Structure formats: structure tokens, C-alpha cells
Design a protein with these regions (language model features):
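Catalytic beta-strand/loop module used to bind and position nucleotide/cofactor moieties
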Residues: 77, 83-85, 93-103, 107-298
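N-terminal lobe of the biotin/lipoate ligase/transferase fold
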Residues: 1-136, 156-158
């Protein structure tokens, strides 16, 4: 009945859907709410093998922590958790990862059959996957700061944290969790954070559809897994082409020790190739050091 249709339309409007009414023509969907809803994300993944493995939650301590708990319980390859609110987001070496409201915080479980040393390039490939997803939704392909940040306008848009669990007997990888946090909305942040932070809304002038962005991440990360061992060279070439660290003079930070070098490129495992002032060359693994530009964050 008309009354039942109107009641449904009214309910959808209350939930944030933009619905236009036209006399004698009915209703049209003008916009969907900017919220991270499991059904909305899955709707963008029709027919995808990971569609039913993706779950959005209102809030979580850390999406990486959530996926690690699920992985320990036997959750399958492709299981993903996403949210707009992390209460205890983590970065590399246990640092706090600032998770402003309006962002997208996403982690996925991968089950590669490999030794840990065979996954040294995983974070670099994850950076490419995240950049491709951002491009698919916004039309902007971010720069990459070696090895785990995406950058817009010299400021951090996205951070990536990869963690692995090891089987005790075989010493092979039981699971890998890839965590990606993207600043989507323009929000007020403390000055010391704001000076280094970018958002898609601030850069493009439009808020991204986070459900679409989450679905794009799922697709990109599934493609990553398929290319992890047999197609990595093309992914690493893409990484190098967009890596703003390459060609820069950089600071290499190992705890309290700071050294200076010139970043020449990356090798086949995504280690940073550097030349020190005395002419010595080396390959620096991402787990060993943090890299800072000489003249700012990037």
C-alpha cells in the first residue's frame, strides 16, 4: 500500500538515505549515508569471494587486534574487520596510531603459505593496494612514503601496519594481518598532529563514500594476495614510481641513533637502497629503521 511504502521511505530517510519524491513518478535514491555498515559494504562486493567475510563494527580497540583474535580462532583467509572508531589504534613499534572520527580503519587476515622472510615485501604491496583503492574512489593516486604511509600534499593520509603470526612447529606464517587506516573527513586535530595529517575531504573537497572505499580495499587486497609471490615485481615497480622517499636525502632512525643517507631506490624485497655520505651503500629493511625526510614529515 501507499502507506506502507511511505513508512519505509520515511524510515530510510531517518537512517540517512537521501530519497527524492516526484509526483506520479515515485521515488529515487539520491544519496546514501556516510556510515560504515556491513550490508552497505557487502553490497559493493556482489559476487566477490570475500563478500561475506567483511564485517563493519561501530567501534573496536584496534582492527588489527580484532583480526589477530579472529585469526587465532581459525578465521579464514579474507576475513576483514572495519570501523570508523578505533579506541586503541596502533602503529609500528607499538606507537599510538591517531584514529580521528570520520576515518576508515580496516584490517584483513591473509593465510599465505610461506616463511616469514618471504613476506618482506608485503607492506610495500599493501601500500600500493591502498593507493589503488583511494584512486578508485577519489580519482587521486597518493604518493607513497617508504614504506608504510600514503601521502597527499606532503602530509600523511594513510598508515599501514602488517603483523604476522608464526606456527610454533613449522616456523611458517600462520596468518598475516594487514591494517590500513585512512583519514577521510576533515576534522579538528591537535596542532602537532594536524600539521602532518591530510584527509581526502580536505584534499579533494569532497567526503569519500567510505563503504565504497572499504569495498575497493577488499578488492585491492585480494588482488595483492594473488600477486604476492608470482606478480610482486609489477607491484614493486608501481611502488617505486610513486615513492617520494626515493631520490631524497633522508634520516634513518634506529632507536636513539640517527644517521643520514641518500635514498637511491628499492630492491626486490622492497628494502630501501641507500648511499651513506662516505659512499658506502646498503639495503635497509623497514623493520629496522624509520625514515624521515630532511625537510619535513615526508
Amino acid at each position: 500500500t501507499r502507506a506502507a511504502v511511505w513508512k519505509t521511505i520515511d524510515q530510510l530517510r531517518q537512517e540517512g538515505y537521501g530519497i527524492d519524491a516526484a509526483p506520479k513518478r515515485g521515488y529515487t535514491l539520491a544519496s546514501v549515508p556516510d556510515r560504515l555498515d556491513t550490508a552497505l559494504v557487502r553490497a559493493h562486493l556482489s559476487g566477490h569471494p570475500w563478500q561475506t567475510l567483511v564485517t563493519a563494527v561501530p567501534s573496536v580497540d584496534s582492527t588489527n587486534n580484532a583480526c589477530k583474535r579472529l585469526a587465532a580462532e581459525g578465521a579464514p583467509d579474507g576475513t576483514a574487520i572495519l570501523t570508523g572508531c578505533q579506541t586503541a589504534g596502533r602503529g609500528r613499534r607499538g606507537r599510538t596510531f591517531v584514529s580521528p572520527p570520520g576515518g576508515l580503519y580496516f584490517s584483513v587476515i591473509l593465510r599465505p603459505h610461506a616463511k616469514p622472510e618471504a613476506l618482506m615485501h608485503l607492506t610495500a604491496m599493501a601500500a600500493v593496494a591502498a593507493a589503488r583503492a583511494v584512486f578508485a574512489v577519489s580519482g587521486v593516486y597518493p604518493d607513497i612514503k617508504w614504506t608504510n604511509d600514503l601521502v597527499l600534499g606532503g602530509k600523511k593520509l594513510c598508515g599501514i601496519l602488517t603483523e604476522i603470526g608464526i606456527e610454533a612447529e613449522s616456523r611458517e606464517v600462520d596468518y598475516a594481518v594487514v591494517g590500513i587506516g585512512i583519514n577521510c573527513a576533515r576534522v579538528d586535530l591537535p596542532p602537532e598532529v594536524s600539521a602532518m595529517s591530510a584527509s581526502l575531504e580536505a584534499f579533494t573537497g569532497q567526503k569519500p563514500d567510505r563503504a565504497r572505499l572499504a569495498a575497493a580495499l577488499v578488492r585491492s587486497l585480494c588482488e595483492l594476495e594473488q600477486a604476492l609471490f608470482t606478480g610482486k615485481d609489477a607491484w614493486l615497480r608501481e611502488f617505486a614510481a610513486h615513492c617520494i622517499t626515493i631520490g631524497q636525502d633522508v634520516k634513518l632512525v634506529r632507536g636513539d641513533d640517527v644517521t643520514y643517507a641518500h635514498a637511491d631506490g628499492i630492491d626486490e624485497e622492497a628494502a630501501l637502497l641507500v648511499t651513506y655520505p662516505d659512499g658506502t651503500k646498503a639495503a635497509v629493511a623497514s623493520g629496522e629503521v624509520s625514515v624521515r625526510g630532511m625537510y619535513g614529515y615526508a
